[in-house]
Amino acid sequence: MANILKTIIENDKGEIRRLEKMADKVFKYEDQMAALTDDQLKAKTVEFKERYQNGESLDSLLYEAFAVVREGAKRVLGLFPYKVQVMGGIVLHHGDVPEMRTGEGKTLTATMPVYLNALSGKGVHVVTVNEYLSERDATEMGELYSWLGLSVGINLATKSPMEKKEAYECDITYSTNSEIGFDYLRDNMVVRAENMVQRPLNYALVDEVDSILIDEARTPLIVSGANAVETSQLYHMADHYVKSLNKDDYIIDVQSKTIGLSDSGIDRAESYFKLENLYDIENVALTHFIDNALRANYIMLLDIDYVVSEEQEILIVDQFTGRTMEGRRYSDGLHQAIEAKEGVPIQDETKTSASITYQNLFRMYKKLSGMTGTGKTEEEEFREIYNIRVIPIPTNRPVQRIDHSDLLYASIESKFKAVVEDVKARYQKGQPVLVGTVAVETSDYISKKLVAAGVPHEVLNAKNHYREAQIIMNAGQRGAVTIATNMAGRGTDIKLGEGVRELGGLCVIGTERHESRRIDNQLRGRSGRQGDPGESQFYLSLEDDLMKRFGSERLKGIFERLNMSEEAIESRMLTRQVEAAQKRVEGNNYDTRKQVLQYDDVMREQREIIYTQRYDVITADRDLAPEIQSMIKRTLERVVDGHARAKQDEKLEAILNFAKYNLLPEDSITMEDLSGLSDKAIKEELFQRALKVYDSQVSKLRDEEAVKEFQKVLILRVVDNKWTDHIDALDQLRNAVGLRGYAQNNPVVEYQAEGFRMFNDMIGSIEFDVTRLMMKAQIHEQERPQAERHISTTATRNIAAHQASMPEDLDLSQIGRNELCPCGSGKKFKNCHGKRQ
C-alpha cells in the first residue's frame, strides 16, 4: 500500500514539473503580447482561427493563445492569471481535472482553455450547477471573450427554442448540466431538423465537476408525458392502511434504507383490502402501492428528503447541496405516495418519453474536463468511468487554515449544546462563523438555539436559496454567523472583512460528518482561501447517521463507563476512524454508481441506435420509399418464418389473415392465390402485391414534398411510441432481474441479454406498425398547413389508420404462443390476445 501511495505522489510531482515547464513557455510570450495594441491583440483570434483551419492543432496554438488571454484579461478584467492558473488551464485543455483549492480563481483559469477550444468553431459548453452561476460567469467572463472576438451565449430553461438555438450556435455557451441534458433529449423528439437546438457535442468544461459527474451521476434526466390512468384513490387507500400499522407490522433495514411488511402486516393488509392472498399475481399493482406508501411514511422524511411548498407541492431536497430540486419528481409512484402522506393534491403519474443519466450524457462529448477543489478522493471513479485524471495544482499561497480534530459527544443534544456555546463565544469576539449542516431540519434546529442564545445569524437552506449569493458574500464580515446546508453557496467566494484576519479568519463548524469525505473537505475549504487564516472544527455524536451505521455501539460503552454524557472525546485516531467509515461508504456508493452505469450502458447503446436512425429520417431530403419498402419486406419475412412449423393449411390461413388485415385490401387476395407456393414464393408474391398498394397510397399525395412529409411523420410517430413503451419495459425488467440475483444469476448479464431480445422485438414491432399504417392509412388530399411550428402536420392528420381487429371467425386455439398475433399488434400471440386464452 505504501508503495502504491508513493507511486501516486511521485506521478503527481512529475506532472506538476511538466506543467510548470509548459506554463513557463506561455510566460515567454508575456512581453510580446504586452507590446501589442488592443486591435493587434484582438486580431490574434482571427489569425489563430485561420491557422487552425490550415491544419495547425490546438496543442500547437496553446502557448500563444494562453498568452493572448492573459494579456486580454489584464486589460479587460484587471486580472492577470498566475502561473498555477495557467497550469490548471493546461490540464483542462488536455481533458482532465485540475484540483484547485477554493479561492484559487477557477473561473479565470477556465478562460484560457475555453478560448483555445472555441477557436475550432465547433462550440464549447461551460457547465455550471445552477443558472445564477451561468449568468454570473457568462456576464463577467463574456466581457473578455467578446473583446477577443468570440461570441458568447447563455442557455436558460426559460428561453424559447429559437433563443436556445442562437445560444448553442455561439463559440462559447454557458448552461446548467440539466438544461444541456433536457435539450439533448428534446432534440431527439422533434419532427423537423430545423427544430433541433444543439450542435454535435464537442468540448465541455464542467464547473464543480464532482458535484455533477459523481454526486448526480445516478440521477436520470427524464422527459415525461402524462399517463391517463387515475390512481389517486389507490394511493390514498394504501396510505390510510400503512398509517394504521404498528411497529411490529413492518421491517426496516437502516443500512440499505429498505422496508417491507412482516407476517402480521401481511395479515392486516389481507383483512384491510379483503383479500385471500396479498401476493397473488392479481394483486401485483396493489403491492406496488403499498410498498410506495411504506417508503413514503417510514423512510422518506419531511424537511430532510423533501419539503412541502406554500403551493402545496412536494419538492425534493438535493442531499448534496441542500437545495430544492424544482421540477424533479420521484419516479415509479413514490412521489404520489408522499403526496398522499402529506395530504396535498396528487398529481398524475407520468410515462417516460426519453431519459439519460449524466454519466452517459457527458461521455458523449469529444472532450470532457472539469474543475473542483476536492476531486482527488474520487480519482478512481473519474478515471474508470470518464477516462479523466485528477491532477492537484499547488496553491498560489500556502494554506494557513487550522483543521482541528473531531469532537465526539455521547448524544445529539450535548453536541448541539457545545456547538451553540462555541458559536456564541466566537461571535462575542467578532470572528465570523459558518455552520455547515446536512439537512434543512438541522439548520432550523440550530437557528432556534442561536435565537435563544441571543446570537443574530443568517440561515441559508433549500427554503431561501434565492438569497444565497448575497448571504455567502457577507459571511466573512466581522461578527457574521451563517448557517448553511451542505454545499449551499458553492461557487461564491467568502471574502474576509476588515479586521477579521487578526481574529483568526473564518471559522467553519461542521455539525456532523457527511458520508463523503469530499463534501466535508468542501465545507472546510470555505475557510482559508488565498492564504487567508482560518479554522475548521467538526462536532459529532454517537447518534449521527454515519456513526450509527458504522459501529457507535462500542464507543457508547466507553462514554457510559467514563460517565461522559456532556463531555467530548477528541483524538486524531477518532478522526481517522471516521474517515475509514467514510471510505467504506464511498466505496459502496461507487460500486452502486458503477452498477447503474452497467445497466444504463444497455439503454445507451439502444438509445444511440434509435436516435441515429431518427436523426437520419429527420434530416433526409429524399424519398424514404427504399427504407419503408425494406420494412415491409422484413415484416413479411417475419410473419411467414414465424409460421414455418405450423401445418400447411393453418400456416396459409394465418398468413392470409395477416395480409388481409395489415397489408392488402381485404378482398384482393384469397387462399387459392397462396396455395402450392413455397415460403420463398409466398414472400415474393405478397411483396410484389404490397409494392402496388404502396404506389397506390403514395399516388394519393399531392406532390413529392407531401410524400416526404408523410413518410417522415409516419416513421417518427411509430418509433417514438414504441421507444417510449420500450423505456418503461426496460425499467420493469431492471426491477425484475434484481430478484434473479437470488437464483445465482448475474442480474446485469440477465438484463443485457433480455434487453437485447426486447430491443429486437421492438424493432420488429416498429417495422410491423409502419407497414400496417402505410398500407392501411386513409390518405386524403389536403392542403399543407402554413404553421411550420406545429408538429400536427398534414401527414399526422392523414394517418387515420383502420384499427386492425381480430377476425370473429378465427380459431385462436390453432395459433402458436410464439407466433405473431393475427390482430396486427406486432406482438407475439402469448403477449397479446393469447393472454386471454
UniProtKB/Swiss-Prot annotation:
PROSITE patterns: SECA, SECA_MOTOR_DEAD. Zn(2+) binds at C821, C823, C832, H833. It catalyses: ATP + H2O + cellular proteinSide 1 = ADP + phosphate + cellular proteinSide 2. One of its GO terms (biological process) is protein transport by the Sec complex. May bind 1 zinc ion per subunit. Pfam families: P-loop_SecA (PF21090), SEC-C (PF02810), SecA_DEAD (PF07517), SecA_PP_bind (PF01043), SecA_SW (PF07516). It is found in: Cell membrane; Cytoplasm. Its cofactor is Zn(2+). InterPro entries: Helicase_ATP-bd, Helicase_C-like, P-loop_NTPase, SEC_C_motif, SecA, SecA_CS, SecA_DEAD, SecA_motor_DEAD. ATP binds at Q85, G103, E104, G105, K106, T107, D493. GO terms for cellular component: cell envelope Sec protein transport complex; cytosol; plasma membrane. Its EC number is 7.4.2.8. It is a peripheral membrane protein. GO terms for molecular function: ATP binding; metal ion binding; protein-exporting ATPase activity. The keyword Hydrolase does not apply. Its main location: membrane. Keywords: ATP-binding, Cell membrane, Cytoplasm, Membrane, Metal-binding, Nucleotide-binding, Protein transport, Translocase, Translocation, Transport, Zinc. Part of the Sec protein translocase complex. Interacts with the SecYEG preprotein conducting channel. Has a central role in coupling the hydrolysis of ATP to the transfer of proteins into and across the cell membrane, serving as an ATP-driven molecular motor driving the stepwise translocation of polypeptide chains across the membrane. Monomer and homodimer. Part of the essential Sec protein translocation apparatus which comprises SecA, SecYEG and auxiliary proteins SecDF. Other proteins may also be involved. Belongs to the SecA family. This is Protein translocase subunit SecA. The lineage of its organism: Bacteria, Bacillati, Bacillota, Bacilli, Lactobacillales.
